[in-house]
């Protein structure tokens, strides 16, 4: 919406691929009304295939960064000397900076996640506090890429984001957008006793904190998505695994996501739109909203305290 509202007919749009043409909703940007549209279609499809082929979480994240690097290198070729102002997706930012193509241009950054330096510092602190949670130390981006992103962000004229935490990192330069709320779909009244965890089941998403809370409060948990902590992670608890494309939200008494980091809280926004209570970490980046409880921290004791009243009603 930000780009659509500010574009002019003289502008160039450079995108990974035309999502409408290739039936890829994730890439379905509106391309009408631009002077020209450049795409990195073969590069994007090839690297997307390689990323999906990786089964280990750390290798998948590494493959996604390599994909962004390859796309940036391809799209940079579309930048002619007369382009003096750029609106850049954060995923491409460090690579464009290292190539030198941002120098001398006014840059606006569209941000959807914390800077890599901040993100990795949080994971490092959590890994130090909880050495038993091995996935907290899974992957770290190369130092040169982290430094390049920091330098590019420092040089950027404007930071555009709907994320509350990200906006707070850039006082005076951040333009905070509203999250795109899904269409409200209120549910029929019926007894619901399960707590939904949108997942995936991994430490950075708060899986360990919820596991301890479920044990302490005798909760039924709907686990959505992949289990990346190992097949016996939820053993001994009242847990049901459900497919992400199922109607699991209709079964949930509440949605709980005590994440250390959260980039795209689409599931939490969908739950709020449906009137489902949400308990989440500050990393969700959502401004105060009816039905939203934001945790001061994502430790088990804090989550147990927040869930205690709800657990009493469920029993």
Label each PLM-derived region with a short phrase.
Residues 70-78, 115, 128-158:
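Membrane-proximal helix-turn-helix segments that form the acceptor-binding/catalytic region
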Residues 185-205, 211-216:
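Conserved donor-binding/catalytic core segment of Leloir-type glycosyltransferases
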Residues 246, 265-273, 284-288:
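Short alpha-helical segment that forms part of, or immediately flanks, the ligand-binding pocket
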Residues 260:
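Aromatic "clamp/platform" in nucleotide-sugar-dependent glycosyltransferases that forms part
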Residues 277-280:
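Short hydrophobic beta-strand element within catalytic cores of glycosyltransferases
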């Amino acid at each position: 919406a930000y780009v659509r509202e500010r574009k002019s007919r003289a502008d160039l749009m450079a995108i990974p691929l035309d999502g409408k043409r290739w039936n890829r909703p994730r890439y379905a940007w509106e391309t009408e009304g631009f002077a020209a549209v450049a795409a990195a279609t073969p590069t994007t499809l090839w690297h997307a295939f390689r990323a999906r082929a990786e089964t280990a979480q750390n290798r998948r994240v590494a493959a996604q960064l390599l994909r962004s690097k390859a796309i940036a290198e391809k799209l940079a070729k579309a930048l002619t000397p007369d382009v003096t102002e750029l609106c850049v997706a954060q995923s491409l930012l460090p690579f464009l900076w290292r190539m030198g193509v941002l120098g001398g241009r006014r840059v606006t950054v569209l941000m959807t996640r914390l800077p890599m330096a901040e993100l990795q510092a949080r994971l490092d602190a959590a890994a130090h506090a909880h050495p038993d949670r091995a996935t907290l130390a899974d992957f770290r981006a190369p130092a040169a890429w982290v430094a390049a992103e920091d330098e590019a962000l420092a040089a950027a004229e404007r930071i555009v984001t709907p994320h509350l935490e990200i906006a707070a990192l850039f006082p005076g330069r951040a333009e905070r957008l509203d999250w795109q709320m899904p269409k409200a779909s209120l549910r029929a009244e019926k007894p619901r006793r399960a707590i939904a965890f949108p997942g995936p089941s991994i430490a950075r998403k708060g899986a360990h904190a919820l596991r301890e809370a479920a044990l302490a409060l005798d909760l039924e948990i709907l686990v959505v998505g992949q289990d990346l902590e190992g097949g016996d992670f939820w053993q001994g608890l009242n847990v049901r695994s459900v497919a992400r494309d199922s109607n699991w939200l209709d079964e949930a008494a509440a949605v709980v996501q005590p994440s250390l980091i959260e980039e795209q809280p689409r599931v939490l926004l969908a739950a709020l739109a449906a009137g489902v209570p949400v308990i989440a970490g500050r990393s969700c980046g959502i401004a105060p909203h009816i039905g939203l409880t934001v945790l001061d921290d994502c430790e088990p004791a804090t989550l147990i305290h927040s869930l205690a009243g709800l657990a009493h009603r469920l029993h």
